[in-house]
Amino acid sequence: MHPRFQTAFAQLADNLQSALAPILADKHFPALLTGEQVSSLKSATGLDEDALAFALLPLAAACARTPLSNFNVGAIARGVSGTWYFGANMEFIGATMQQTVHAEQSAISHAWLSGEKALAAITVNYTPCGHCRQFMNELNSGLDLRIHLPGREAHALRDYLPDAFGPKDLEIKTLLMDEQDHGFALTGDALSQAAIAAANRSHMPYSKSPSGVALECKDGRIFSGSYAENAAFNPTLPPLQGALILLNLKGYDYPDIQRAILAEKADAPLIQWDATAATLKALGCNTIDRVLLG
């Protein structure tokens, strides 16, 4: 078991501990539960889906990286496939506050980058901030997404974001988590191809500036993140953050990164290079390359 889970795990009910122990045994537990695993946990504990998600939130929050605030937020995004995806907030010392990842963004990106097609619900241990409510409004589940908070009845996103502004106001038809392929040819080595593939999946209807980042770890594992724009612009999630979300949730740390590649267009209206390089250098990665999409 990864050390970060030990404290939270010890506080779980005995029957949940017994059912989870084999799943958490791998130090690189992928921070997700398949539909089959969810069903097994429900059977072992007698909990329904909502109660189980709340019980698991401390494990999601244990994935938080909060050296600045020390305020750990956990989220669990429930995919329509039946898979549950953990998420947690991340702060980056030496970078800017704007590079921060919120727990809801983490769980949603985890699901999206894992190939999930849509979300049915999200469970969070604290009320979503306005930034996250706006981020969620970009999803193809829209204002119908169910939000579950401790001690409250579940409500749809529309209840947390009345008079919402979103992609439909800008006549955007393709939404976040819809399947997209921008068709750039995969060239170069495996890391370059992973970055290009991530750029191909970008959700960037506002700027038309595709980008993707791929991180190579010392053991050869590659994590890639795609750019995810938002109708309100500021809640946009850069591609580096997508890759760092996966790296963190899969049990890796920043010193494990040995090389990074950003794929983007040289003439795009928005450029990721400076912010990507600065944040990676703050995390200790200095081997950073750029592949230009043609």
UniProtKB/Swiss-Prot annotation:
Any one Gene Ontology cellular component term annotated for this protein: cytosol
Record note on cofactor: Binds 1 zinc ion.
UniProt xrefs under SUPFAM superfamilies: Cytidine deaminase-like
Keyword Cell division: no
Keywords tagged on the record: Hydrolase, Metal-binding, Zinc
EC numbers on record: 3.5.4.5
Binding-site residues for Zn(2+), renumbered to this chain: H102, C129, C132
Top-level class of the enzyme under EC nomenclature: hydrolase
Cofactor: Zn(2+)
BP GO terms, sorted: cytidine deamination
Residues of the CMP/dCMP-type deaminase domain: 48-168, 186-294
Superkingdom, taxonomy of origin: Bacteria
Active site as annotated: E104
A matching Pfam family: dCMP_cyt_deam_1
Catalytic activity: cytidine + H2O + H(+) = uridine + NH4(+); 2'-deoxycytidine + H2O + H(+) = 2'-deoxyuridine + NH4(+)
InterPro entries: APOBEC/CMP_deaminase_Zn-bd, CMP_dCMP_dom, Cyd/dCyd_deaminase_Zn-bd, Cyt/Deoxycyt_deaminase, Cyt_deam_dimer, Cytidine_deaminase-like, Cytidine_deaminase_bacteria
Role description: This enzyme scavenges exogenous and endogenous cytidine and 2'-deoxycytidine for UMP synthesis.
HAMAP family the record matches: Cyt_deam (MF_01558)
Family label: Belongs to the cytidine and deoxycytidylate deaminase family.
Protein name: Cytidine deaminase
Annotated organism of origin: Escherichia fergusonii (strain ATCC 35469 / DSM 13698 / CCUG 18766 / IAM 14443 / JCM 21226 / LMG 7866 / NBRC 102419 / NCTC 12128 / CDC 0568-73)
Encoding gene per record: cdd
